[in-house]
Amino acid sequence: MLQISDWNGGACSDSPGDIDDCKHYKSNGERKEVVYIDGGHHGNEHLGTELAFLVAEYYIQGWGTGDQQVLEILSNTELHILIMLNADGNDFDTRWNVNQVDLNRNYDHYWNTCDSTQPGSSAFSESETLANSIYMNEVVPDADLYITMHTGVWIMLYPWGKWPEQPSDWEMYHHIRDEVNSVSYT
């Protein structure tokens, strides 16, 4: 797990000097936005892992070279990046982990509602999803944005990609989708 932030740009109001036990704030005292990114839920979606790695590399190198755009983002945002969740699946080039469980279906949200998936014996039965859940609930419980990198199809899913209800901020998601789709891939 990588945590990337500009620790010099803000204040550590709870425990100055103890970076592990404090929350990071913008220079104006407001809480930084928190973004959590994970890659490699499905081991055979290698580009999902690579995308998470490239995001981490971009911000680490940009911070190191003093890239002003990167420094501005990191002065206002705390990034948490899990590059590869499913190491077994990556090694065996399969969607599932070594226990033949689809980690993306092993969370407690609508667990075991898809007949065609292998969700595991119970929600969080797999160490990978349990550890990811603990991290998300204990370290980034108030994340402003969660991005999970998948590369099986070219779609953008947002809460909830499977159900007909739209989230209250659906216009924002549609705007992001339209912006991404407007990029030329020639």
PLM segments and residue spans:
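Gly/Ser/Thr-rich active-site loops/lids in small-molecule metabolic enzymes
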Residues: 165-182
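Active-site/substrate-binding loop(s) of hydrolase catalytic cores
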Residues: 25-168
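Soluble metallo-hydrolase cores and metallopeptidase-like ectodomains found primarily
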Residues: 1-35
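Conserved small/polar residues in nucleotide/adenosyl-binding loops
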Residues: 186
